[in-house]
Amino acid sequence: MPDILVLCYHAITPRWPNELAVDPAALERQVRLLLRRGYRGMRFADITSPDGPPRRLAVTFDDGYRSIAEHALPVLGRLGVPGTVFVPTAHVGSPDPMSWPGIDDAARGPYADELRCMSWEQLEELAHRGWEIGSHTSTHPYLTRCDDAALARELEDSRAAIVERLGACATLAYPYGDTDRRVMAAARRAGYDLAAALPVRLKRPAPMGWPRLGIYPADVLWRFRLKVSRPVRAARVRLGGAALMEEPPS
């Protein structure tokens, strides 16, 4: 069995003191470390390919912050690693800052620029550079709280928007890592091939619930080394994800 490691970042910026914002230099150190250990970077959609290398790394980004294009794209470009960004399509190109639970008015004030989503033109540039653009639903809701009709709209409309602009959309990341069997079944019906979960809630990887490791500013290099080690990753899966090195919500 291949060793598949999927990382989840959010904003990549030195300017926003928030638990979702990782410094670009930290991103570069972390990915370089894994490349030295023999991992090969690939898009999230490709991690289950039968022809892939024995050690596979997918670097993913949730929410589509503009800082991903500004800072993460050049970092991963230098390292020869394609990224995957999951975008809430209702926010793409909006001049308004995005707003999630935990981001209060004070954060939206001085750091409003950091909370804006990329434009379709920026996403097209990422795709041109070999990145994958996946869905993070339309409006970023807790999917398990949606009724069946709203759930289908969130999954289908976001995928359709990406397909219309970029030609393809095979993958999904659940907002807040919030999923269950009903949501996963709806994701498959909506046409997704692979979906990312965070935090780890499943006992084993599954196409509609693939585990990721959330990476945050607190993950300095020694902690990052521990977090990505195979024994710790295996323990997190056995314990259901939240009991070891607990992470903020996505």
Which residue ranges define each predicted feature?
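Aromatic- and acidic-residue-enriched segments that line the glycan-binding/catalytic groove
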Residues: 93-113
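C-terminal active-site subregion of NodB/CE4 polysaccharide deacetylases
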Residues: 1-60, 66-71, 145-250
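Generic enzyme active-site microenvironment
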Residues: 60-61, 134
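Solvent-exposed loop/turn segments at secondary-structure junctions
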Residues: 65-66, 90-93, 139-141, 178-179
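Acidic (Asp/Glu)-rich catalytic clusters
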Residues: 1, 35-36, 74-80, 118-135, ...
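Histidine-centered divalent metal-coordination motifs
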Residues: 10, 136, 140
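Generic beta-sheet signal
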Residues: 86-88, 136, 197-198
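A short alpha/beta connector and helix-capping loop motif
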Residues: 71-89
